[in-house]
């Protein structure tokens, strides 16, 4: 991911970049395939779905964002999309490596998580949703920072259009994942919704995506304002995903880790700076 990211970023400033883009694309494809192989190996060893704890959720969301971005790049040949795809994959693996786990990341699953079909579908769909939200947020942040350094209005509008479409996908999977989570909760402890911190986090992310899309659809905000909302959506998603796990409470929080607040608030600060670059 790192090599591909460097190649894509350098190519942004070159006129003759065909060969460099070819190498960057090959590196990205190799990284995504190796990422997928790692997930498949964990599934084979554990005989479990790809998402069983906070570590595996980060790894899975990262490959979703990279695969999503890489596919969009191949179809549309937009360099910012490719660069964000590489950055998303690289960041996910770095975060996973530095999570406050001690020892094995493939430990025994808790009894309530060692469950059924509905749990598998819930975690898969909700993590695809979160991965899409973060990809849209990072792409929005890129265009806001690029605007600060002189990107034209045409590039801003193209970026807003791409982010809008990605958020549509994110909204669909966040909604589906939240509903499937309710079905699993009903089967596990007899209630569909109980305002558990994890449930509240998923609902916050879902509502933020919906509000952001409606603000753009109803022309409540400009392209730049829409990108700001999409960028801030990363903070909402990070809280719904990481924050409630780091709190260490809740019935079906799959993180079960302590610590990490420094990195969480560092991420929040960087996202606020990216959004503030629109001012």
Ranges and model annotations:
Residues 1-13, 21-48, 52-107, 118-149, ...:
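Hydrophobic cores of alpha-helical transmembrane segments in multi-pass integral membrane proteins
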Residues 115, 151-153:
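Membrane interface segments of multi-pass transport proteins and intramembrane proteases
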């Amino acid at each position: 991911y790192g090599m591909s990211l460097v190649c894509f970023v350098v190519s942004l400033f070159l006129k003759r970049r065909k060969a460099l883009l070819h190498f960057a694309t090959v590196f990205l494809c190799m990284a995504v395939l190796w990422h997928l192989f790692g997930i498949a190996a964990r599934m084979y060893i554990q005989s479990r779905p790809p998402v069983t704890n906070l570590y595996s959720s980060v790894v899975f969301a990262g490959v979703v964002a990279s695969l999503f971005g890489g596919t969009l790049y191949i179809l549309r040949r937009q360099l910012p999309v490719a660069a964000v795809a590489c950055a998303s994959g690289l960041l996910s693996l770095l975060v996973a490596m530095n999570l406050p786990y001690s020892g094995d990341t493939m430990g025994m699953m808790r009894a309530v998580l060692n469950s059924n079909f509905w749990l598998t579908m819930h975690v898969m769909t909700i993590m695809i949703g979160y991965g899409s939200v973060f990809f849209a947020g990072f792409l929005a942040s890129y265009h806001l920072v690029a605007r600060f350094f002189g990107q034209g209005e045409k590039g801003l509008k193209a970026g807003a259009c791409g982010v809008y479409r990605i958020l549509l996908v994110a909204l669909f999977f966040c909604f589906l994942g939240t509903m499937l989570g309710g079905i699993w909760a009903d089967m596990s402890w007899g209630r569909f919704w109980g305002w558990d911190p994890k449930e509240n986090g998923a609902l916050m992310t879902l509502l933020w995506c919906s509000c952001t899309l409606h603000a753009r659809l109803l022309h409540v905000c400009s392209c730049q304002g829409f990108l700001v909302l999409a960028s801030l959506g990363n903070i909402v998603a990070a809280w719904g995903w990481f924050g409630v796990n780091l709190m260490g409470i809740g019935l079906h929080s799959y993180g079960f880790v302590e610590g990490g607040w420094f990195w969480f608030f560092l991420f929040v600060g960087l996202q606020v700076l990216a959004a503030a670059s629109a001012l």
